[in-house]
Regions:
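C-terminal helix-rich "cap/oligomerization" subdomain common to oxidoreductases
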Residues: 25, 91-128
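Contiguous beta-strand/loop segments that form the cofactor/metal-binding neighborhood of enzyme cores
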Residues: 1-61, 90-99
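Detector for glycine-centered tight turns/loop "hinges" at secondary-structure junctions
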Residues: 27, 71-72
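Tryptophan-centric aromatic hotspots in well-structured domains and transmembrane helices
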Residues: 59-60, 85-87, 121-122
């Protein structure tokens, strides 16, 4: 990520609505919004590309999505087993059982990179 912008709304010194744009070295951009001031938000997610988009209900645990590709649309629905943290709990259990110190799906470096990006967004937001 070469550039970060955040059009944040603050209340009592706390960011309550963030509109973050990330710019990458190749010129591609990513945008996301997160808020605690919008009770009507359905917590939906959209991924928009040059040839189409994916729209989903609850972005953090979608059970349905609509894929729009070059003018065609297809919907997919899937039931999920367990609660919101089932896969995380299963991964920890597997790691303990088999003495794995790092998950295959997300390495320690992935975690460090993610935290680093969040810290950079925080610096842009709060100027610290």
């Amino acid at each position: 990520v070469t550039h970060i912008e955040n059009d944040a709304t603050f209340k009592n010194g706390i960011d309550i609505h963030d509109k973050v744009t990330l710019t990458f070295a190749n010129g591609a951009t990513a945008y996301f919004e997160c808020a605690i001031d919008d009770l009507q938000n359905k917590r939906s997610g959209k991924i928009i590309g040059t040839k189409g988009s994916i729209e989903m209900d609850y972005f953090y645990r979608p059970t349905s999505a609509t894929v729009n590709y070059e003018g065609e649309s297809q919907s997919v629905t899937r039931e999920l087993d367990g609660d919101d943290f089932y896969s995380e709990i299963a991964a920890v259990h597997h790691g303990i059982s088999y003495i794995n110190y790092e998950a295959k799906r997300m390495s320690h470096q992935d975690t460090i990179d993610e935290v680093s990006l969040l810290e950079r967004i925080h610096e842009v937001t709060y100027g610290k």
